[in-house]
Amino acid sequence: MVYNKLILTQKGQIIMKLFHLSDLHIGLKLMNRDLTEDQQYILNRIVQYAKEKQPDAIMIAGDIYDKAVPSAEAVSLFDSFVTSLKESVPQSTIMMISGNHDSAPRIDCFRQVLLKQNLYMVGNPPEKEEDHIERITLNDNYGYQDYGQTVAL
């Protein structure tokens, strides 16, 4: 999903353009069929689309891999995807969270190194209060929505 509608302030200023991806399931095999080539094609298309649309932020929300312990090939494919994505849209912030198919500790593995590159990965919820971010609440013409406390990126 790509959020491609411009959000405008009362002064007509653009606020943010956001890409939201989820359930990539990299490394998935379907009925013993290896989907690596198909996944590579789709990930390349996502990179091309991001380069064209230049989002401010990219959120990859869970199920990055299909297994908690992904194959080396799946990890390499995702690494190549994120590298290409960052090269195509260097100004974009990339945020990733683990899903139920991912290993939270593995997602957290290089968290501190990636922070320096404007890449945020969260596997486990933060343990310290200062690592949490504020509650997100929206109140607009469409109604009120309270998203509760979210984890820090």
Report residues per predicted region:
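Conserved short loop/turn motifs at secondary-structure junctions
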Residues: 64-67, 96-100
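Proline-centered loop/turn at the N-terminus of a beta-strand
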Residues: 93-95, 120
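N-terminal active-site segment of His-dependent metallophosphoesterases
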Residues: 2-83, 87-91
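His/Asp/Glu-rich metal-coordinating catalytic cores
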Residues: 70, 101-153
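A short linear-motif detector with a strong N-terminal bias
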Residues: 37-38, 74-76, 98-101, 143-145
